[in-house]
């Protein structure tokens, strides 16, 4: 992933971003914030941003390994990015409105954008410190013909609220028509009809304020010598659920996913 032409210049990925931004704009969103590395900015802007800015307002923020809170340093030998939680945190100073988080190389379909937009503008209060939304895809609609996938396998209560999310690797459809995965506990109950997170979340600016403090907690708990631990959105949301600080409305979408890194679109 050292080369923009290899990592971002490929036509397929550009088309996915074009479709997602078109769908977001049609749903009512009016700005996109691209979260990228600073060293690819010029080529990214030339290949993608220059076309997109004629359709929708565009801003950029940079996710860098050394963009850490005061008092923290990058562990010697670490090269792996800090994860999707830090990526979204990078937007704190430019996003002051309700927003939706997406992966730039996943195509989500129109329905998810419409449902999350309408949820945000409704101002629905779910009764806890943080009100959030999640696009709930049907697991069988998000499988790949090219191997296993990682999904946030979700448990949804009778009120349509997220009660648990399990970041699960190695998901595939077995020859017997049953879902297989790497987590033994999840394997006991996982089914093709389960709702899964595709990292498409709806939130309000106060969530970014929370990330700013919680990222410090995460960094303080990284064990010495661990050069790969990541600050990931599904784990962050699961933590808020377990602490009783958030309610997350699951908005089901029947659209089929396809994908080929993190972007944020807001109202």
Question: What do the predicted segments below correspond to?
Answer:
Residues 61, 101-103, 133-138, 252:
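Short beta-strand segments
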Residues 14-103, 108-115, 122, 127:
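Conserved N-terminal catalytic core of the sugar/cofactor nucleotidyltransferase
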Residues 65-70, 140-142, 171-173, 257-258:
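A short acidic, often aromatic-flanked loop/helix-cap motif at beta-alpha or helix-coil junctions
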Residues 1-12, 266:
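Single conserved hydrophobic/aromatic residue that forms the stacking wall/gate
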Residues 110-201, 205:
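Conserved core of the sugar-phosphate nucleotidyltransferase
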Residues 212-216, 222-245:
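A C-terminal functional module that forms or caps the active site or interfaces directly
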Residues 36, 202-203, 261:
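A conserved hydrophobic position in a structured secondary element of the catalytic/binding core
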Residues 195, 249-255:
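Catalytic beta-strand/loop signature of glycosyltransferases that borders the donor
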């Amino acid at each position: 992933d050292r080369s923009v032409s290899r990592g971002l210049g490929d036509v397929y990925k550009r088309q996915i971003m074009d479709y997602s931004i078109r769908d977001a704009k049609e749903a009512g969103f009016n700005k996109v914030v691209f979260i990228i590395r600073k060293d690819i900015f010029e080529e990214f802007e030339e290949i993608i941003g220059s076309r997109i800015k004629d359709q929708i307002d565009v801003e950029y923020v940079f996710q860098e390994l050394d963009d850490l809170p005061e008092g923290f340093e990058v562990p010697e030998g670490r090269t792996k990015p800090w994860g999707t939680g830090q990526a979204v945190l990078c937007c704190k100073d430019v996003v002051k409105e309700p927003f939706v988080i997406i992966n730039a190389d996943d195509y989500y379909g129109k329905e998810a954008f419409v449902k999350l937009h309408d949820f945000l503008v409704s101002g629905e209060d779910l009764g806890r410190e943080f009100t959030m939304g999640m696009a709930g895809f049907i697991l069988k609609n998000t499988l790949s013909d090219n191997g296993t996938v990682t999904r946030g396998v979700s448990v949804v209560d009778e009120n349509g609220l997220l009660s648990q999310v399990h970041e699960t690797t190695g998901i595939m459809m077995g020859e017997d028509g049953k879902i297989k995965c790497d987590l033994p506990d999840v394997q006991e109950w996982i089914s093709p009809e389960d709702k899964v997170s595709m990292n498409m979340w709806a939130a309000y600016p106060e969530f970014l304020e929370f990330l700013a403090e919680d990222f410090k907690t995460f960094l303080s708990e990284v064990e010495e010598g661990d050069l790969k631990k990541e600050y990931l959105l599904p784990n962050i949301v699961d933590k808020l659920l377990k602490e009783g600080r958030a309610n997350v409305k699951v908005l089901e979408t029947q659209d089929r996913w396809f994908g080929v890194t993190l972007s944020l679109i807001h109202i």
